[in-house]
């Protein structure tokens, strides 16, 4: 039997007898008939297996498939090469569930595919042990074929304070393999990538995008077989002996999210953004994302309630809507060497409790938030002195420190109950609207008792967050992991915001936030205006670039508002107010990135309303322009037959020749006065760009008349 999943843009075709194959994933087909799928049976070449070798949902060596199998495992050395035959298919309008079995190996494979109206395909495999003996699983993946014309790959690498930096490579015989073994989603290898036709861009080319929703170790590969067939394979990465299934037990892969675009990366991103907005993001749609002030870069561990209330007063005056006390409020947390795990209020710093501070914040009309890092412990803590056996470690080995801290074993029932009790106390005792949930180190030798435990640790974290969300449904949670070390769709099901990076350097943030935008919409991307001197790079940047960079996310600020100059306060207030004016558009529209000619020196992106009657775009000059003039900027996403009025909302102080003349003697004509041009002109001819200094930006808005 042949089956089809379809929406207005995408078709996914299956052949299920005797083995299930996903035969096509791409542009919607016109005048489709199910029997057409049979035309996809290929030629059988000489000097190979004498029959067609199907490429199934879980590729099997036993069928003559010499690529990486979808399942590797055994039952005491037996049943190591299963072959799954289709037994049952259940189809609805937007989903298909396929049950396949190997009666010899006594294994069942259940494959789930759901095609959302956004154009995102959700895929998952589940393995069930039907035999009497335990089945040891070494690897278990979800596999998607891609066409031969997918010649190029774009993925993301990075490190702390440098997340989501893109890189491209040609897909050749050796393929591409990405592994993350750091115990969290990681800064180094985001579990998502795109493959596409050679030279695919933001607005052109065919693109297939995938993301593995998993917050632990992962492996993703793009492979090319000797017959030219290509595939993507994604999975949670297991330690040796980590996963075994007793009779009747099941194991599921993480959900894989995939989509197709025939209009470049922008359309791919819009599919992912629409999917998240409709299915995963959990804050009230009618509630604006409040502007944050986090105290960390203002006071670090030096907590004084009277001074913090002064900070809150100043914060409210510049337009802050959510005030967050960061690290240092609990235990004897005077530095990062001590106190983690002691989730009791530090009465030395807060002799009257947190209530006076919270009341002051609320009276100013702001929400109140607080920082926690529940998964961690310092050895210099009351908790460790009482329970040294609560660490996540392998007995007999010396666990290395990371940022002076260690991990708690969440699978230990006593640890889980302690954390649940302390967090319940915190959220029940105080009027808290938001918690920043941090996780500040990588995981080495993660042993639960003597067994490897990353999968269990990750799933138990999910369970803890699920319970807290059920008990406190109005409390929002931010996922932070030394910045962007835990950003993925599965953790987003339990949180409402990501701390994108510990870097507030606006030049680096331009690249980091652009990279994140391929998979996540602006409203979940924490983007703060930092101080003039960035604490991670020691670069000093103008407020213009800092403010406009933070504008395109869930805005916040990092400062001590009591100490900054009046000029800086005015700058923060200006960009906060500008963000609030544009927030309804920024957090509901279609995010677009523009292809610019001088893409090493400049980048441009924006948000277009769903109508699309209005849009806002930033042009950010990162380095010195390659040429004296930067050419024309062609916009995207507009209505060709509509007239748009163009307005410059923000630009550097030194750009106007009448005032300064530092970079230009004449502005481009469209910047001299109110200009109206057609969408067709703006998208095909474009606007001549002004000359900009490095580390500056302009913001323009276009609106239909």
Predicted regions located by residue number:
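C-terminal beta-sandwich/jelly-roll accessory domains of carbohydrate-active enzymes
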Residues: 623-705
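Glycine-rich, aromatic-flanked loop segments that form ligand/cofactor-binding clefts
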Residues: 50-55, 60-81, 204-217, 259-283, ...
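Polysaccharide-binding surfaces and accessory modules of carbohydrate-active proteins
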Residues: 1-14, 20-223, 239, 643-664
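Conserved, mostly hydrophobic/aromatic
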Residues: 9, 125, 248, 293, ...
């Amino acid at each position: 039997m042949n089956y089809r999943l379809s929406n207005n843009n995408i078709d996914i075709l299956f052949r299920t007898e005797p083995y299930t194959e996903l035969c096509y994933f791409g542009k919607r087909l016109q005048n489709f008939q199910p029997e057409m799928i049979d035309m996809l049976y290929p030629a059988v070449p000489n000097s190979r297996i004498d029959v067609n070798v199907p490429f199934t949902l879980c590729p099997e060596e036993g069928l003559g498939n010499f690529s990486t199998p979808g399942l590797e495992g055994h039952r005491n050395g037996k049943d190591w090469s299963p072959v799954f035959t289709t037994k049952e298919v259940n189809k609805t309008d937007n989903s298909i569930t396929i049950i396949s079995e190997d009666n010899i190996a006594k294994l069942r494979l259940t494959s789930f595919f759901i095609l959302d109206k956004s154009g995102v395909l959700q895929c998952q495999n589940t393995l069930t042990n039907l035999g009497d003996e335990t089945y040891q699983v070494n690897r278990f993946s979800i596999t998607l074929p891609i066409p031969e014309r997918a010649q190029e790959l774009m993925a993301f690498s990075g490190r702390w304070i440098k997340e989501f930096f893109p890189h491209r490579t040609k897909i050749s015989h050796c393929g591409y393999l990405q592994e993350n073994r750091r115990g969290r989603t990681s800064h180094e290898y985001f579990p998502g990538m795109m493959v596409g036709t050679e030279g695919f861009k933001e607005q052109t080319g065919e693109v297939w995008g995938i993301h593995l929703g998993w917050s632990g170790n992962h492996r993703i590969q793009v492979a090319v077989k000797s017959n030219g067939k290509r595939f993507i394979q994604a999975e949670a990465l297991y330690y040796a002996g980590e996963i075994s299934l007793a009779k009747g037990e099941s194991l599921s892969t993480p959900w894989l999210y995939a989509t197709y675009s025939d209009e470049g990366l922008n359309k791919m991103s819009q599919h992912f953004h629409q999917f998240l907005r409709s299915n995963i993001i959990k804050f009230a749609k009618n509630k604006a994302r409040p502007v944050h002030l986090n105290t960390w870069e203002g006071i670090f561990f030096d907590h004084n309630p009277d001074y913090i209330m002064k900070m809150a007063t100043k914060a409210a005056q510049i337009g802050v809507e959510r005030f967050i006390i960061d690290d240092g409020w609990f235990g004897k947390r005077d530095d990062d060497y001590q106190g983690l795990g002691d989730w009791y209020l530090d009465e030395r710093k807060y002799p009257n409790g947190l209530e006076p501070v919270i009341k002051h914040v609320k009276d100013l009309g702001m929400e109140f938030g607080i920082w926690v890092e529940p998964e961690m412990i310092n050895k210099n803590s009351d908790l460790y002195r009482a329970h040294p056996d609560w660490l996540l470690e392998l007995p007999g080995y010396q666990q290395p420190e990371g940022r002076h801290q260690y991990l708690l074993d969440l699978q230990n029932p006593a640890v889980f109950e302690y954390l649940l009790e302390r967090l319940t106390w915190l959220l029940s005792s105080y009027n808290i609207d938001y918690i920043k949930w941090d996780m500040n180190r990588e995981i080495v030798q993660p042993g639960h008792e003597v067994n490897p435990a990353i999968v269990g640790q990750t799933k138990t974290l999910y369970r803890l967050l699920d319970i807290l969300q059920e008990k406190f449904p109005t409390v929002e949670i931010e996922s932070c992991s030394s910045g962007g070390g835990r950003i993925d769709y599965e953790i987003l099901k339990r949180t409402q915001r990501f701390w994108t990076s510990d870097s507030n350097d606006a030049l680096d943030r331009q690249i980091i936030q652009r990279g994140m935008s391929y998979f996540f919409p602006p409203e979940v991307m924490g983007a703060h205006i930092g101080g003039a001197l960035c604490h991670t790079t020691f670069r000093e940047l103008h407020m213009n670039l800092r403010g406009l960079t933070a504008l395109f996310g869930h805005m916040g600020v990092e400062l001590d508002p009591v100490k900054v100059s009046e000029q800086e306060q005015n700058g923060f207030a200006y960009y906060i107010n500008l963000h609030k004016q544009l927030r309804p558009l920024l957090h509901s529209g279609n995010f677009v990135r523009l292809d610019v000619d001088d893409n090493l020196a400049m980048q441009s992106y924006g948000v277009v309303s769903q109508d699309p009657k209005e849009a806002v775009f930033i042009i950010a000059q990162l380095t010195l322009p390659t040429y004296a003039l930067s050419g024309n900027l062609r916009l995207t996403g507009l209505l060709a037959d509509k007239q748009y009025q163009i307005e410059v909302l923000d630009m550097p102080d030194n750009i106007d020749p009448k005032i300064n003349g530092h970079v230009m003697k004449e502005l481009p004509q469209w910047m001299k006065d109110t200009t109206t041009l057609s969408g067709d002109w703006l998208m095909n001819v474009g606007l001549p760009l002004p000359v900009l200094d490095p580390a500056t930006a302009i913001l323009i808005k276009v609106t239909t008349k």
